[in-house]
Structures are given as structure tokens and as C-alpha cells.
Amino acid sequence: MKDLKVVYALIQNENGEVLLVHNTDDDGWSLPGGKVEYGETLVEALEREVMEETGLTAKVGDIVSINEGKSTRMNVHTLFIMFKVTVDEYKTEIHMKDEIAELRWLTVEEADEKLVYYHHSLKEFLSNKATYYNEGYVD
């Protein structure tokens, strides 16, 4: 079974709204993020994905959720890691128009309705905290 890591950004604006992206491949909504590429750290991948999908420069903070799932059909074991992310500016721009159809700032309640794969409210994730530390290369 192949291992896959996927990172997501929980970004909240000054009004308390969270940013969601509407994906073209499955016609669904998600937090900005995506697959960690070979050689990337989790933070590098998330910074890249947020820029590609939203045009925002991400300041990656603490981990707020780790989920996992297995797919026998795809023969993959996936770790989904959600980070709290801050940005200096809230003006968004889709750079990956073939992957992202729309960006939308929504209230937490509205976002919860669109994010059907989470069993908890984003409110819960906004208050979670687990420190992330990259230990770099160890010989």
C-alpha cells in the first residue's frame, strides 16, 4: 500500500470567516491544500499549495488535526494534516484555474455544511494545537 501525505490550511480572516476552495476534479469544497511532493517538508508543501490555489502567502502555524484513511481500491494509505495558517493579506487569486473553480470566505457554520468529510466543526479545530517541529536532516 502506497503512503500519501496531504496538507490543508485552516485560514481565518479578520471577520472570523474561513477560506474554502471549490475543486474542479470532484466538484466539492475543501480547505486549501494538497499532496506533499517528494522531497518537500509539510510546511513547504502547504506554502506551495496555498500560493497555487489562492495566491496567498501562508505563514504556517500549529497542527490542528491529523486524520488518516485507507483506500483498497486505490491501494493508498493517506495522512491528512491540517495546519492553522495566517496571512498578511486577504486578497485571493486562483493560480491553478484547472484545479480550482472558486474561492470563498465563509462563516464557520457555512464552511461546516460544505466540508462533509469532517465529523467535527471547524470551531473545534480552530482551538486545537499541536506544535509542529521540522527536525531537518538527521544522519
What are these regions (language model features)?
Residues 1-3, 73-79, 95-100:
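A generic structural micro-feature
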Residues 1-18:
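Conserved N-terminal beta-strand and adjoining loop/helix that marks the start
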Residues 11, 82-86, 104-107:
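Short, well-ordered beta-strand micro-motif
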Residues 28-29, 67-71:
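Short, solvent-exposed loop/turn segments at secondary-structure junctions
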Residues 57-65:
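A short coil-to-beta-strand element that immediately follows conserved catalytic motifs
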Residues 69-92, 119, 125-126:
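Active-site-adjacent beta-strand/loop module that shapes the phosphate/pyrophosphate-binding cleft
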